[in-house]
Structure formats: C-alpha cells, structure tokens
Amino acid sequence: VIADEFNLDKISVENCAMAGRSARTFLDEGRWDKVYEALQPGDFVLIQFGHNDAGAINTGKARAELRGSGEESKVFLMEKTGKYQVVYTFGWYLRKFIMDAQEKGAIPIVLSHTPRNKWKDGKIERNTDSFGKWTREAAEATGAYFIDLNKISADKLEKKGIEKTAAYYLSLIHI
C-alpha cells in the first residue's frame, strides 16, 4: 500500500513486514537478518512495531518483549520449545534495528504504530505512554527520524468520527 505513495520510476519499495510479528519475533525468525543483508547505503528503512509486542513473553504466542526502552534483559524458559531465551526491552530491539541500518549507511525512519479502533468519550485512544513513547525514545537515542503516525492517524480518524473510522479496520467476526 505504501508503494502507491511513491514514484516507482525513481525508487523501489520492498515491504518486508510480516503480520503478527513483534520486534522480538521479527529478529528471532531471521527476518531482520534478511533486511540487514540487503541494505545499501542511502536506503530508507521504515521501522514500525508495537501492535503485536504486548502479551505473553514465554507462553502462548510468546512474542512480547520486556516493557520499556532501557537496556534490561531477562532469561525466560520458553514453554513451546523448552529452551531458555534472553529477552530484551521493546526499545532495545528498535535500537538494534536502527543502529544496524545506520551501520550499513541506510536511513532509518521510525514510526509509532497506528491506533487501534478503541474510543472513549469521542476520542480514539492514543499510545503515548508505552509503545509510542518507547518508539520515540529509541529514535531520539539513536538520532533516527521519527514520525508519530499514532498521533497523525488518530487526529485524522477523530475528524472522521467513530462510524466512518470503522471502515479502516478489519472485522474479526469471521476470523
């Protein structure tokens, strides 16, 4: 979809995102390694996580990170594999992606995640106190560009209102 916004005669867009991935699982599954290997100096790398980064760390889907943007890590026994894994903060994973891109001479652009379709008192819920905040902090700590897509999207959706906004969100009734 984002490719529609660019002149494809001048640039190429490669969407390496995978539904349902957190920053941690994107790294663990080797998806970031493929991006990293393909990076060339001057490439723009848009980095956005946060929708799938909450929840269980070592049970069920086991894709969450430690909350926060610090350097903390903790070892967990993974229920699914029976193996131990070091898990870092959400911000640690973002900083890794950003610094890796910078190391290759690429230009990382970090985006806060789009808001969920959750409303209270006529306002869509913003994410400024957790993943949105940690995303901004990771960008600031590394000198990367930051786009507050959560705010930009929420502002536009609020102007449209709750009823018109529903069309932009997937119905999960039949899934």
Regions from the language model: what does each represent?
Residues 9-12, 40-45, 103-109, 142-145:
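Loop/turn elements at helix/coil->beta-strand transitions in domains of secreted/extracellular proteins
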Residues 26-28, 56-63, 113, 121-123, ...:
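Short, solvent-exposed loop/turn and secondary-structure capping segments
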Residues 6, 101, 135-139:
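A generic structural signal for well-ordered alpha-helical segments
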Residues 115-151:
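Substrate-gating cap/lid alpha-helix
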Residues 1-95:
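Conserved SGNH/GDSL esterase-like catalytic core that processes O-acyl groups on lipids
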Residues 160-170:
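Glycine-centered helix-coil hinge/cap
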Residues 95-129:
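Active-site segments of SGNH/GDSL-like serine hydrolases
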Residues 173-175:
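Conserved small/polar residues in nucleotide/adenosyl-binding loops
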